[in-house]
Amino acid sequence: LPDELEGMPEYSPLVFPMMDYVIGHNIDFDADCCQIPGAVKRICTLAMARAIWPNTSHTQSALLYMLSNDRAATRERLRNAHSAGADVIFCYEILLAILSERPHIRTIEELYAFSEECRIPKVMTFGKFSGMPVQHVETGWRNWYRRQTDKDPYLLRAFELYPYDPMYKE
């Protein structure tokens, strides 16, 4: 609210040092909010977690509980779950668990490639085709989506990789 801003210091945008990669849980949200330049490669722990552990909730809290050996201690740690510092630590712990599941990933570029692969949906997450394989999304709907102004580039890539196939079986 405007009255809460009275007497506060002037806003100045964040300035990030030169970086090649940024890692986060739902990284596009963080990168867009922080105005991280588009040339920086985004690595998404949310997308990788969805690929590695498809049958669980993928919030940071749910993943930390799933990965935990001490739920009481995890519950205590999660009391600070909505601070930036805690989010960074939790994201790091999830990243370590992802890397333990994928020991062949040895470099940041391999991690980025895996993240990019995981970000391409295989199942629709919204609309009338929600929950269905991308191959079941009809051509007309695909064409409609391509005409929208706010398109997900990863869904467009999925349309390229997985053409419409009404006979497709999982």
Language-model features: locations:
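Acidic two-metal-ion nuclease catalytic site recognized across multiple nuclease folds
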Residues: 94-170
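Conserved DEDDh/DEDDy metal-dependent 3′-5′ exonuclease domain
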Residues: 1-57, 61, 66-70, 81-88, ...
